[in-house]
């Protein structure tokens, strides 16, 4: 039986480059990939020690790395060779060629900036999850953007998309039977974006949602009367708030997000 291979992806910045190259290379073989381990932002020899020791415990492992910091790269190379582990430097030859041609040494400030960007993105994504669907009204006060609207207007994916643009976004469903939290009326309405939609389109979306859950699609939730009632109520709330209203009918999440980003930059919503 052909032995599987374990791949260890290591980087002192984001590991995506190593992962992409490894995936493309592996596609040329019928090799069984037993496991893939990823290590981003490796910044000291203790981390390298742990990674190499783990790889050494696998009978057939490969370390693929994009290390730039010279001391760490050399240490990784040395430790891997000591344990007889195959190691591939996919970034080094390119950096060396540029350095030889220009006489300029690579700088590592970008690694720090990249890590800070990564941590910031994780922070805003966690924010979007924590304050999704009105879970905690405190999120309304802390958010850069608050998205409101009836159910199935893509509030959650919109907030996640905005999070990837480093924007802390919370969202809140508007339901006729439940008064909006007072926090919604305490913040600057310029931070609030109301989503509305054509009732007929929303009815279809909700019916499909019910079917996907194995439920009867003639439930009150997906009736035209109920949908119109919810949208009317939501638009009344938006009018009271004086917030920006976006019609998301047949709009992709990216398109709606770009409208919001444009407004935040001082542009128009249309």
UniProtKB/Swiss-Prot annotation:
Top-level taxon of origin: Bacteria
Residues that bind ADP: 149-156
The answer to whether keyword Ribonucleoprotein applies is no
How would you classify this enzyme at the top EC level? Answer: transferase
Q: Which UniProt keywords apply?
A: Kinase, Nucleotide-binding, Serine/threonine-protein kinase, Transferase
NCBIfam families the record matches: PRK05339.1
Name assigned to this protein: Putative pyruvate, phosphate dikinase regulatory protein
Q: Which organism is it from?
A: Caldanaerobacter subterraneus subsp. tengcongensis (strain DSM 15242 / JCM 11007 / NBRC 100824 / MB4)
């Amino acid at each position: 039986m052909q032995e599987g291979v374990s791949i260890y992806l290591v980087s002192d910045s984001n590991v995506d480059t190593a992962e992409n190259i490894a995936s493309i290379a592996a596609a040329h073989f019928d090799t069984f990939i037993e496991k893939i381990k990823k290590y981003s932002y490796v910044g000291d020899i203790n981390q390298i020690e742990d990674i190499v020791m783990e790889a050494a415990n696998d009978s057939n492992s490969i370390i693929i790395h994009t290390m730039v910091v010279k001391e760490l790269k050399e240490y990784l190379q040395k430790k891997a060779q000591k344990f007889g582990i195959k190691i591939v430097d996919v970034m080094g030859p390119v950096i060396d060629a540029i350095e030889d041609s220009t006489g300029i040494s690579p700088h590592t400030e970008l690694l720090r900036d990249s890590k800070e960007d990564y941590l910031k993105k994780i922070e805003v994504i966690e924010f979007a999850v924590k304050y999704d669907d009105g879970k905690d009204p405190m999120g309304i006060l802390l958010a850069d953007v608050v998205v409101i609207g009836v159910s199935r207007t893509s509030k959650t994916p919109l907030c996640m998309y905005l999070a990837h643009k480093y924007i802390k976004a919370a969202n809140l469903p508007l339901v006729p039977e439940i008064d909006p939290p007072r926090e919604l009326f305490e913040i600057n309405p310029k931070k609030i974006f109301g989503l509305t939609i054509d009732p007929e389109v929303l009815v279809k979306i909700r019916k499909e949602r019910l079917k996907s859950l194995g439920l009867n699609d003639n439930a009150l939730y997906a009736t035209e009367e109920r949908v119109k009632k919810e949208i009317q109520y939501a638009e009344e709330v938006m009018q009271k708030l004086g917030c920006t209203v976006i019609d998301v009918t047949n709009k992709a999440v990216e398109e709606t997000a770009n409208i919001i980003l444009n407004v935040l930059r001082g542009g128009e919503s249309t």
